A protein has these predicted regions:
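Conserved GNAT-fold acetyl-CoA-binding loop/helix
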Residues: 38-60
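Juxtamembrane/interface motifs at transmembrane-helix termini
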Residues: 49-53, 61-63, 105-106, 138-140
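Acyl-donor (CoA/ACP) binding surface of acyl/acetyltransferases
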Residues: 1-38, 74-179
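A short hydrophobic/aromatic micro-motif that marks alpha-helical segments and, especially, helix-coil
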Residues: 41, 50-52, 66-67, 127, ...
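A short helix-loop-beta-strand connector motif used in the catalytic cores of GNAT acetyltransferases and
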Residues: 60-73
Length: 179
């Protein structure tokens, strides 16, 4: 694990990807992917349609010293793919806990991207958490498999509001404890 000099956010490498802090130059690809309803509807926070300026605002928030989460670009250029194929994040919670989130562009689905990058972030544990939570929509069992394959345990059902769907959506909540 290497530290990025600007943000002090670690760079995490996997066999195929480099998980690195976002750059302003990532805006075009992030916007292209998040405009896709299939991506937005599997998240709680991405609106659909994506309003003008939303991506730049998101990147500015991610680069802020006062940010509440660390967000990594999934850089696949070393594998001969796109420079950004998705994002993975850890949002800081109280009591040395965080919440894992990720999305992958549809062109790269079913290729193990989410599993590989989630496992790498969990192994690196860059925030030195005791516990990491994750929540997935119940209509996305592939994301649930990613979590169970990374050692997460199911803890219960809940609901979360999806901005893109403009509705509450049934979720499964998972936990991974380190201590």
């Amino acid at each position: 694990m290497k530290l990025d000099a600007i943000t002090t956010q670690p760079v995490v490498e996997t066999a195929r990807f480099v998980l690195r802090p976002l750059r302003r130059s990532d805006a075009g690809l992030i916007e292209f992917y998040t405009k896709d309803e299939r991506v937005a509807c599997q998240t709680t926070t991405i609106p659909h349609p994506l309003p003008p300026g939303a991506t730049e605002t998101f990147i500015n928030r991610c680069l802020s010293v006062e940010r509440e989460e660390d967000v990594w670009a999934i850089d696949a250029s070393a594998a001969g793919w796109s420079e950004v194929v998705g994002l993975v994040s850890l949002e800081r919670l109280s009591r040395n806990q965080s919440e894992l989130g990720y999305w992958v562009a549809p062109a790269f689905w079913n290729q193990g991207v989410a599993s590989e990058v989630s496992a790498a972030i969990i192994e690196a544990n860059p925030m030195e958490n005791d516990t990491i939570f994750a929540t997935v929509f119940q209509d996305n069992p592939a994301s649930a498999r990613v979590l169970t394959n990374c050692g997460f345990e199911y803890v219960g059902d809940a609901e979360a509001f999806s901005v893109a769907r403009n509705a509450k959506v049934a979720t499964w909540t998972y936990i991974r404890k380190f201590t």
